[in-house]
């Protein structure tokens, strides 16, 4: 990697972790009325959205690592395009956390570094395995978001609109990875990913 590329990637990391994210698409549910939630429910929803925001931090780092090690320019461009959509998810979840009076995870820098490392390793294994890891990640995120939709209050239409649009985007990302030749990961790898995700979501919900 050239010094210029190193600066660009470092700037990308800093902006992801520290700078307010921006979205080219409208915020889902922005025109809907905000629900009058009891304090306990607001805290719960803020925790769920913090987990989702943390997940998008991880997605940015994962895509960055995979793009850096991809051998195929077409796949690299697809990863960058998906990362742009994940940036929109960052903006949406950040906005909703603020509306709920919540805060982002204190551990975002650690989540970012860990996910960047995973992305670099996945990419180094070759594009088909890197894409397989990406596809499985997105499938597990979809399942996670389905769980959040079941957990969110029925009248919290704003949060539900954000989570549902994120879910649709993640489905599309998984389908894109498969279209570009993603390999099916072995079952032990899928189980390990689920365990790691469960630890991350549990910690991010609280911290």
From Swiss-Prot:
It is a peripheral membrane protein. Pfam families: COQ7. One of its GO terms (molecular function) is 3-demethoxyubiquinol 3-hydroxylase activity. It catalyses: a 5-methoxy-2-methyl-3-(all-trans-polyprenyl)benzene-1,4-diol + AH2 + O2 = a 3-demethylubiquinol + A + H2O. GO terms for biological process: ubiquinone biosynthetic process. GO terms for cellular component: plasma membrane. Binds 2 iron ions per subunit. Belongs to the COQ7 family. This is 3-demethoxyubiquinol 3-hydroxylase. The lineage of its organism: Bacteria, Pseudomonadati, Pseudomonadota, Betaproteobacteria, Rhodocyclales. The gene is coq7.
């Amino acid at each position: 990697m050239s010094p210029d590329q190193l600066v660009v990637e470092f700037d990308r990391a800093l902006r992801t972790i520290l700078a307010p994210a921006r979205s080219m698409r409208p915020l889902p549910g922005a025109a809907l009325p905000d629900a009058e939630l009891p304090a306990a429910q607001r805290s719960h929803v803020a925790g769920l959205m913090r987990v989702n925001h943390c997940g998008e931090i991880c997605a940015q780092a994962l895509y960055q690592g995979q793009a850096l090690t991809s051998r195929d320019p077409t796949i690299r461009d697809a990863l960058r395009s998906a990362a742009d959509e994940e940036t929109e998810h960052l903006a949406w979840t950040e906005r909703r956390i603020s509306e709920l009076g919540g805060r982002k995870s204190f551990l975002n820098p650690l989540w970012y570094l860990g996910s960047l490392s995973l992305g670099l390793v996945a990419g180094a294994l070759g594009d088909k395995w890197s894409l397989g890891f990406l596809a499985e990640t997105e499938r597990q995120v979809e399942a996670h978001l389905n769980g959040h939709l079941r957990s969110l209050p029925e009248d919290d239409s704003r949060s539900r609109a954000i989570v549902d649009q994120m879910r649709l985007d993640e489905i599309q990302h998984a389908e894109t990875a498969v279209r570009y030749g993603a390999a099916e990961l072995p079952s032990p790898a899928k189980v390990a990913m689920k365990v790691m995700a469960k630890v991350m979501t549990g910690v991010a919900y609280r911290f």
